[in-house]
Amino acid sequence: MLRSRATINCVKSGRAGRALSRGMATFEGQPAARPNRLSKLLVRVGLATVGFYVGGVTLSLNNDQFGELFCDNVPLAESLVEMYEEFRDEKMQASRMSLDELKQKFGELGTKVDRIPNRGADPALTSQAVAALPASKEVRLEDESLVKLRLPEVEQLGSCKRATPLVESVNAAVAAVNEQSLLLPEDTYNAVHDAFTKLKSALQAINEDIRTNVAESVAVQYGQASKDLHESFEIRAKSREVELTQQFLNEFNAFKAQLEKHSSEELASALKANEQALLAKQSNEVALLSMKQVEEFTKILSEKLDQERQGRLSKLEALNGSVQELAEAVDQVDTLVMKSEVLSQLSLLTTLLKNKLHAGDESSVKIDSELARLKTLCDILPGRPSKCCSKNPQLLDVVVSQLDSLASQQLILSNEQLYNRWTLLQKDLSTSSLLPPNAGILGHISAKIFGFFLFNKNGAPVDNDIDSVIARVGQNLRLSKLDKAVEEVVALKGWPRVLCDEWVQEARKKLEIETLIDALDCEIRSS
């Protein structure tokens, strides 16, 4: 046992040495630490290594898969596991029960079996016999209390990147152990937990040492770098100052030369401009003097001409006034004659239009030529204010424009045509008077049949039935009273009014044209 413990200590020392060498290799490039910190670091690394091996051996004994992984990948792991198993076997052999104790424990079982006959056992006798036997001593084996091993993960050690791989490897081992869900005795669990706690403390101490060393190294390097940077900055500033001074002097000299050149050019251009201005002023004064002389000469000449005119041509002014008065009188007479002629032509034209509209021809009337002549005469009529100077349009212009819009390129029905169309409508109107309200097809057929038996009225009856209205309209058309005829037709209602709609439009158009011609005639006669 002493040999095994010595071997374990040697293995631990070897692992500590290798861990120290690995740690020193990992943290390559760090500044050299002081002796006391190095010894602390070695102690902590040794404790962490011991805790790692103790936890690995414990888990290997309880989990075969982890044991194979631990023995295959970790140096000296297999020998440590074998040493611990030998130590455990020796302890178990020392605690085994002797032969006498086994006989005392299990001997009474044979006595009970021998007492039972082969033919079977009577329940009553067996119970009495068993009750008479002395009670056997109960031997209890105390079960060891098992605890589930659950190790927490090691947290990342701040912002130290060099300790991160070590922490990640420890966390990977912890995760593998936690996945096995091992059940350990309480003392073993406490030992593993204490070792893991020491491992975490050692990792934290390593992290603190690394941070301290890094901070000191950074401070030293920062001071040296600041000093070097300050010196280089002063050197560059001096060289830059010399360069800027030389550049400024060069630019100043160039600007000075350019300014002198520009000033010389401006002075020369100013002198030239002043010279030209003086020459122009002199020429202007000479021209002004010559103009004054010409004006004086013209004035003298006009005075001489006025004197000559007053002497010999004094009567020409009176003759000129008489000629102007005669010209004005001739213009007035010409205007009156022209106006009279235009008015007479307009009067004749209106009479022609009236006769054309009231003619008894059976053909339609077209007055486009008369309208063109009417517009020409209205345009040349003297004495009318111009359209651009008058705010309100003249009656003559309004009448002519309305006539042009109504009759231009249009055919106007004569009185004979209106009468003939009305005669054609009489039969339909008489038939429509027989239609009931909202008549259908049967109503129209019945009205058409009974219409053949109707008698037409003649003359000017005073009744208000449809036959009397038809008779009065025909009488008014024969007497050329178109306005009264249209008034009678417009008063109709219902289907008769719908039948006469086209006739009413043509009659109204003719009445409007006749009214406009009458208004034009009145305006011409009043002019």
Curated annotation (Swiss-Prot):
Q: Topological domains (Mitochondrial matrix): residue ranges? A: 25-40
Coiled-coil regions, chain positions = 313-335
User: In which broad location class does this protein mainly occur, judging by the first location in its UniProt entry?
Assistant: mitochondrion
**Pfam families, sorted:** Mitofilin
Q: How does the UniProt record describe the way this protein sits in the membrane?
A: Single-pass membrane protein
Q: Which residues cross the membrane?
A: 41-61
UniProt entry keywords in alphabetical sequence: Coiled coil, Membrane, Mitochondrion, Mitochondrion inner membrane, Transit peptide, Transmembrane, Transmembrane helix
What stretch of residues directs this protein to its organelle as a transit peptide?
1-24
The record's similarity note reads: Belongs to the MICOS complex subunit Mic60 family.
Function field: Component of the MICOS complex, a large protein complex of the mitochondrial inner membrane that plays crucial roles in the maintenance of crista junctions, inner membrane architecture, and formation of contact sites to the outer membrane. Plays a role in keeping cristae membranes connected to the inner boundary membrane. Also promotes protein import via the mitochondrial intermembrane space assembly (MIA) pathway.
Subunit structure of this chain's protein = Component of the mitochondrial contact site and cristae organizing system (MICOS) complex.
Please give the name of this protein.
MICOS complex subunit MIC60
Q: Which organism is it from?
A: Lachancea thermotolerans (strain ATCC 56472 / CBS 6340 / NRRL Y-8284) (Yeast)
